[in-house]
Amino acid sequence: MKVTLLIPARFGSSRFPGKPLAPINGKPMIQHVYERASLAKGLDAIYVATDDDRIKDAVEAFGGKVVMTSAAAASGTDRINDAIEQLGLSDDDLVINLQGDQPLIDPISIEQIVSLFERHPGEFEMATLGFEITDKSELDDPMHVKMVFDNDFNALYFSRARIPFGRDTNDYPVYKHLGVYAYTKRFVNAFAKLPLGKLEDLEKLEQLRALEYGHKIKVAISAFDSPEVDTPEDIRKCEQRLAVD
């Protein structure tokens, strides 16, 4: 089983145009993501998947690999699907989808999600990461997606609202979703052909499509947070974290 990590990156963003190239401590953000991913063991290849020449040039400037995808890609998964077809991966090869706005991703978290497939072959089609929320300001922030899972760590639901809701207490763990996915090439091909899900459209969370169509998502709980950069203000916070990392 070949393991390929893809970092989808687009230049356009309503909240933060040009986000992948935003400088963080003198390097474009996409370089931080790529270099952190390259520290993970067990990966056969890493590519940035983009439709923008500016991102392509920046990645190649630091020695990274790029696969150019269609500008018509409607979602991150569509971009991933386009990339894996170009790369000629086999149906059973493992694909890691790491968001391009996670410059603080810990390599161990990537290894953790890969090991799920290695330890449980054929038991599920998709896996992702969660982290127990420690910053209470994130509990009711819709930018931080919450998740619940069963006793076997199969995802039950993802929401921008706080889930679960404690009717009689606030003293219970709440987990947020970290935007890292793992799946086989075969599953990505099938997923990309599924119609938009009703819950997916309501919450604007693509992973809900898998649950709506009956697919199992296995969850690994990471010991490391991986906050996403959504606004220019997040850059400053990221630089502070990197200073002590």
Curated annotation (Swiss-Prot):
GO biological process: lipopolysaccharide biosynthetic process
Native species: Shewanella denitrificans (strain OS217 / ATCC BAA-1090 / DSM 15013)
Pfam family, one: CTP_transf_3
Gene3D superfamilies: Spore Coat Polysaccharide Biosynthesis Protein SpsA, Chain A (3.90.550.10)
InterPro entries listed in its UniProt record: Cytidylyl_trans, KdsB, Nucleotide-diphossugar_trans
Keywords: Cytoplasm, Lipopolysaccharide biosynthesis, Nucleotidyltransferase, Transferase
Catalytic activity: 8-amino-3,8-dideoxy-alpha-D-manno-octulosonate + CTP = CMP-8-amino-3,8-dideoxy-alpha-D-manno-oct-2-ulosonate + diphosphate
Subcellular location: Cytoplasm
Entry's family note: Belongs to the KdsB family.
Gene: kdsB
Annotated pathway: Bacterial outer membrane biogenesis; lipopolysaccharide biosynthesis
E.C. no: 2.7.7.90
CDD domains linked to this entry: CMP-KDO-Synthetase
Gene Ontology cellular-component annotations: cytosol
A GO molecular-function descriptor: 3-deoxy-manno-octulosonate cytidylyltransferase activity
Name recorded for this polypeptide: 8-amino-3,8-dideoxy-manno-octulosonate cytidylyltransferase
